[in-house]
């Protein structure tokens, strides 16, 4: 089977990770101790993608939990699914990274990273055919951002041919946890551009908006936000966990979604959106799901795709869905909104179907889009970065851990390059490209 090893780093990563494991344990018929008491063969068939079978019908997540302070781990352990995880797979320090990327990446995190890699190695050795890794973390803090990206590059070194997917919580414009978020995020993006194969961007503000506007929750808790994220993560990984007519795995997803290696930052969405307690029991149809799924209000990253164009997107439908209906709807979306899709990638929507819906729903859909409008997000962080960096504000916290200002300058320019690459492909048309071909062809696509 094609196994995936899951890592969660830092407070945010561990909380999202815990929600994810809770969601998929439920879908696979596991109780909070990992004992199987489900009803369907399909739940068992691909259990091994995310779970190891231990003795006595018990399944253990292939998860590595990492943090630089014990607090969040204790919370996970004391939570409803705390007994699910293998105790040796909790790796934590005592000092904390204090929202400082340099501590996570160079000092505190670097001391712990070998212990984490030992656990990762052990998990990888327990796999038949490892497909890749997924990591949940935030980009604004110290541990998730600094140590998370350190782990990604170390794992990259050791498993160069395996996929690396990240679920990254990006700082949001209105909801800020720390002043130095722009620094941490820029330094992290600098790493992700080089070392990740696919990054699913999630941001708290967009999640807040969904909770307030769509779910009508007056003051959403992080629990509600994490529930939304886990719904998306469950959707993105459906095809890996259940047999379906049109399956995709991490690599297929990347092949279909990433037209140029650096442009692998995706927006995600989910439909139908329901709050944690109230699963609406009204029937949803494929057209409704499609319409909801492509609605900017449903996107979990604060950038509006109407300001850019889709390079590619992927839609994953779950439940009793007619294949033909999905195809028709997708064609429909593309024809009606052709201005939002680049015309130089024909048929740029990939669809996948899975017969098993999430718990409490008849059908659902998950949306993954590679849109040039994601540059808004990087632009926003970049502007905040520049404002502080110009005055060298807060820099001493980073240089004190042995970082060089040069590294900040590099990260800044790498992110600015990323923004202009997105812009370049947004503006590119089929007709204008003819003249540019002479200089560009060898650089972009060296033909075999």
Curated annotation (Swiss-Prot):
Composition bias, Acidic residues: 429-448
The keyword Glycoprotein appears for this protein: no
Key word Membrane present: no
Pfam families on file: Tubulin, Tubulin_C
Gene3D superfamilies: Helix hairpin bin (1.10.287.600), Tubulin/FtsZ, C-terminal domain (3.30.1330.20), Tubulin/FtsZ, GTPase domain (3.40.50.1440)
Keyword annotations of the record: Cytoplasm, Cytoskeleton, GTP-binding, Magnesium, Metal-binding, Microtubule, Nucleotide-binding
GO BP annotation list: microtubule-based process
Chain segments carrying region Disordered: 425-448
Residues involved in GTP binding: 11, 69, 138, 142-144, 204, 226
Top-level taxonomic group: Eukaryota
CDD domains: beta_tubulin
Cell compartments where the protein resides: Cytoplasm, Cytoskeleton
InterPro entries per the UniProt record, alphabetical: Beta-tubulin_BS, Beta_tubulin, Tub_FtsZ_C, Tubulin, Tubulin/FtsZ-like_C, Tubulin/FtsZ_2-layer-sand-dom, Tubulin/FtsZ_GTPase_sf, Tubulin_C
Cofactor(s) annotated in UniProt: Mg(2+)
An MF annotation (GO) of this entry: GTP binding
PROSITE patterns associated with the record: TUBULIN (PS00227), TUBULIN_B_AUTOREG (PS00228)
Protein residues bound to Mg(2+): 69
GO cellular component labels: cytoplasm; microtubule
Family from the record: Belongs to the tubulin family.
Self-association state and partner proteins as the record states: Dimer of alpha and beta chains. A typical microtubule is a hollow water-filled tube with an outer diameter of 25 nm and an inner diameter of 15 nM. Alpha-beta heterodimers associate head-to-tail to form protofilaments running lengthwise along the microtubule wall with the beta-tubulin subunit facing the microtubule plus end conferring a structural polarity. Microtubules usually have 13 protofilaments but different protofilament numbers can be found in some organisms and specialized cells.
Function in brief: Tubulin is the major constituent of microtubules, a cylinder consisting of laterally associated linear protofilaments composed of alpha- and beta-tubulin heterodimers. Microtubules grow by the addition of GTP-tubulin dimers to the microtubule end, where a stabilizing cap forms. Below the cap, tubulin dimers are in GDP-bound state, owing to GTPase activity of alpha-tubulin.
Protein name listed in UniProt: Tubulin beta chain
Organism lineage string: Eukaryota, Fungi, Dikarya, Ascomycota, Pezizomycotina
């Amino acid at each position: 089977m094609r196994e995936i090893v899951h890592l969660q780093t830092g407070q945010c990563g561990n909380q999202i990770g815990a929600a994810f494991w809770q969601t998929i344990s439920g879908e696979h018929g596991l109780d909070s101790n990992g004992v199987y008491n489900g009803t369907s063969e399909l739940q068992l068939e691909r259990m091994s993608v995310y779970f190891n079978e231990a003795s006595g019908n018990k399944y253990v997540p292939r998860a590595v939990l990492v943090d630089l302070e014990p607090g969040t781990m204790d919370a996970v352990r004391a939570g409803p699914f705390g007994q699910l995880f293998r105790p040796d797979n909790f790796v934590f320090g005592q000092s904390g990274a204090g929202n400082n990327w340099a501590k996570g990446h160079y000092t505190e995190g670097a001391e712990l990273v070998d212990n984490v890699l030992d656990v990762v190695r052990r998990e990888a050795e327990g796999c038949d055919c490892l497909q890749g890794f997924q990591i949940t973390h935030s980009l604004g803090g110290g541990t998730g951002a600094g140590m998370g990206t350190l782990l990604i590059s170390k794992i990259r070194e050791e498993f160069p041919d395996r996929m690396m997917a990240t679920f990254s919580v990006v700082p949001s414009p209105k909801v800020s946890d720390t002043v130095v978020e722009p620094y941490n995020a820029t330094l992290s993006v600098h790493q992700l551009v080089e070392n990740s194969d696919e990054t699913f961007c999630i941001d708290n503000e967009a999640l807040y908006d969904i909770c307030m506007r769509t779910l009508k929750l007056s003051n959403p808790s992080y629990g509600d936000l994490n529930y939304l994220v886990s719904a998306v993560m469950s959707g993105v990984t459906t095809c890996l966990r259940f047999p379906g007519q049109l399956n995709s795995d991490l690599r297929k997803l990347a092949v279909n979604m990433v037209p140029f290696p650096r442009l692998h930052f995706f927006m995600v969405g989910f439909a139908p959106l329901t709050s944690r307690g109230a699963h609406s029991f009204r029937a949803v149809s494929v057209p409704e799901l499609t319409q909801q799924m492509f609605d900017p209000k449903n996107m979990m990253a604060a950038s509006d795709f109407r300001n850019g164009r889709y390079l590619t997107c992927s839609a994953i439908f779950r439940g009793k869905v007619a294949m033909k209906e999905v195809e028709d709807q997708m064609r429909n979306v593309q024809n009606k909104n052709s201005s939002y899709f680049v015309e130089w990638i024909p048929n740029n929507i990939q669809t996948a179907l899975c017969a098993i819906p999430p718990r409490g729903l008849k059908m659902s859909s998950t949306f993954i889009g590679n849109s040039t409008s994601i540059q808004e997000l990087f632009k926003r962080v970049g502007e905040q970065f520049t404002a502080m960096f110009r005055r060298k504000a807060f820099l001493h916290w980073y240089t004190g851990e042995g970082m060089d200002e040069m590294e900040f300058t590099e990260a800044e320019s790498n992110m600015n390059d990323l923004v202009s690459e997105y812009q370049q492909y947004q503006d590119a048309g089929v007709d204008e490209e003819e003249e540019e071909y002479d200089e560009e062809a060898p650089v972009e696509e060296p033909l075999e």
